[in-house]
């Protein structure tokens, strides 16, 4: 327990906040090149084949990023934009690829939450 005089002289040390997406180095997004595109199985209660990509970022760091949405056009050497955000049931996946930016096309046929999947507004059909 510090004395009052010690607190006046030195103050308390602020706790450092640890980044949840360190590879982005404080940037909101980073550009990268897909090194490998593959599927992984999620943790225990869930079952699926989740689409992920190993991405080498423009700062040289290599990360595993999740590809959201149904279907994608990504392959090796595709250039993508990566943002922070983990996938709870995939251990070690702490980044997501932004759909509709650079080489990652938007999700086809998406009608709701389109902005999150890079989908353009659908054409209005003539209603009878």
Swiss-Prot record:
GO cellular component: ribosome; small ribosomal subunit
Coiled coil: none
Positions of post-translational 3-methylthioaspartic acid modification: 89
Annotated CDD domains: Ribosomal_S12
Recorded GO MF terms: rRNA binding; structural constituent of ribosome; tRNA binding
Ranges that cross the membrane: none
Biological processes per GO annotation: translation
HAMAP family to which the protein is assigned, alphabetical: Ribosomal_uS12_B
Subunit description: Part of the 30S ribosomal subunit. Contacts proteins S8 and S17. May interact with IF1 in the 30S initiation complex.
NCBIfam families per the UniProt record, alphabetical: rpsL_bact (TIGR00981)
Record family assignment: Belongs to the universal ribosomal protein uS12 family.
Name of the featured protein: Small ribosomal subunit protein uS12
């Amino acid at each position: 327990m510090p004395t009052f005089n010690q607190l006046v002289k030195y103050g308390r040390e602020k706790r450092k906040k640890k980044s949840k997406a360190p590879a982005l180095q404080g940037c909101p997004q980073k550009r990268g090149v897909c090194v490998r595109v593959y599927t992984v199985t999620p943790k225990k209660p869930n079952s699926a084949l989740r689409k992920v990509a190993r991405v080498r970022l423009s700062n040289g760091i290599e990360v595993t990023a999740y590809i959201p949405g149904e279907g994608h056009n990504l392959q090796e050497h595709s250039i993508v934009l990566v943002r922070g955000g983990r996938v709870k049931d995939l251990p070690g996946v702490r980044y997501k690829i932004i759909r509709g930016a650079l080489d990652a096309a938007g999700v086809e046929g998406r009608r709701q939450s389109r902005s999150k999947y890079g989908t353009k507004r659908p054409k209005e059909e003539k209603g009878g």
